[in-house]
Amino acid sequence: MELKTEEEEVGGVQPVSIQAFASSSTLHGLAHIFSYERLSLKRALWALCFLGSLAVLLCVCTERVQYYFCYHHVTKLDEVAASQLTFPAVTLCNLNEFRFSQVSKNDLYHAGELLALLNNRYEIPDTQMADEKQLEILQDKANFRSFKPKPFNMREFYDRAGHDIRDMLLSCHFRGEACSAEDFKVVFTRYGKCYTFNSGQDGRPRLKTMKGGTGNGLEIMLDIQQDEYLPVWGETDETSFEAGIKVQIHSQDEPPFIDQLGFGVAPGFQTFVSCQEQRLIYLPSPWGTCNAVTMDSDFFDSYSITACRIDCETRYLVENCNCRMVHMPGDAPYCTPEQYKECADPALDFLVEKDQEYCVCEMPCNLTRYGKELSMVKIPSKASAKYLAKKFNKSEQYIGENILVLDIFFEVLNYETIEQKKAYEIAGLLGDIGGQMGLFIGASILTVLELFDYAYEVIKHRLCRRGKCQKEAKRSSADKGVALSLDDVKRHNPCESLRGHPAGMTYAANILPHHPARGTFEDFTC
């Protein structure tokens, strides 16, 4: 018998030759390069073609990997029909912040300069520009002789002197059913005291609509009360040159930001606002720039751009003026009229118009907005002017200058989804690489595993030949001893070669009386 060599025992089975591996490999062209033939032009051409294909493959794969790490995205647009839609919140503000009749002597004393009704000497600045009736009332209120001022609070002033929805609202219908001022919730914005219809707050359910078109939404008739507008004798942030209302249509999940996002509605017109709900889905970094985390704010629970802006503006004013405006959340003290004039209004104007770095709000990953199309017609017509004047006990001129109708509805009962999607995902990358591997070198993932497996066997064998595995093998042999199988022993044929062994190696007859006289080793194996 030929015993195994020490090298075979230590190093294991020697791996097959490169020619044998190439002939059985699934990698195309490898068998022609590593063949048993002598070096020839054919083998050289095969090697050249293989290396060229491999180079092209590496270039294409590199380009695909670079494209993947550019994180491109595409935008998918779809329209989805719905059986019903949640009607949006509608916030409206009169462009005049304070009613002239509600400004008291104490209000005029504290806020007269802020409203440009008085100068810094508590005097009416330009009596020639004033209406005679208003001037008479104002002169009486501006007489501060023996007047003892009382404490003044801007929040209370805005709430008391702002326009009342119960006086403004002449008619209200939602889906053909009557609604009232009780369906409007008071909300403060930079325009002062405003009102939100269908706010979804205070335990009230969000209203839904079942059809599109006029008559299936909100229709209101308002009196803007121009007779109550403050006289304008100067330019301040609290005075308005316009007449009408400002309207914002928004989701119930975000606060109104009407001074930046609202649209105007003029008296003397019926304005039709056709809406379409749009649901926007943006991708977070690195494919997009949306904010996927919840808002870290003490004032708002859910993140939105308007909530972020209001939160940022509030913090900015508190840091710079040590107070907050009436429409801002929090527990900081309200600004006084002097702080409004000297600090709050200039600081907020600077922040909104010029500072592009302080209040930078990222787009939320999920957003609902409402696309709008506006159209309008003149009211009242000549045929209806007298009727409306009689109905509301006003003159025809008053009706034309103060009455407006606002009609908000869904154009159709569907919503539009605008969704960002990854243009190239990891599955696409692997598919492209796999396809190019199959095209250029005829390889697959299993082919790559074949190459790694063969390389592992070759490296392992060579390391063991250099003695790096022998120490472990010798240590193992010293611990365990040499283990021979029964077949290995029999192949030495001890029964024939050791029959004439000296008697000193035989068993004693009294131990094995019926056994032939053989040596211990022969007896065991035979």
Swiss-Prot record:
The principal localisation class reads membrane
Q: Where is this motif: GAS motif?
A: 442-444
Give the membrane topology: Multi-pass membrane protein
Q: How is this protein activated or inhibited?
A: Inhibited by the diuretic drug amiloride. External calcium is required to potentiate proton activation of ASIC1 at physiological concentrations, but at higher, non-physiological concentrations, it inhibits activation. Also potentiated by other multivalent cations like Mg(2+), Ba(2+). Activated by FMRFamide-related neuropeptides. Inhibited by anti-inflammatory drugs like salicylic acid. The spider venom psalmotoxin-1 specifically inhibits the ASIC1 homotrimer. The snake venom mambalgin-1, mambalgin-2 and mambalgin-3 inhibit the homotrimer of Asic1a (ASIC1 isoform 1).
Q: Which residues cross the membrane?
A: 50-66, 426-456
| Phosphoserine modification, residue list | S477, S497
**Entry annotated with the keyword Oxidoreductase:** no
Tell me the impact of changing F174Y: No significant decrease in inhibition by the spider pi-theraphotoxin-Hm3a
PANTHER family per record:
ACID-SENSING ION CHANNEL 1, AMILORIDE-SENSITIVE SODIUM CHANNEL-RELATED
The name of this protein is Acid-sensing ion channel 1
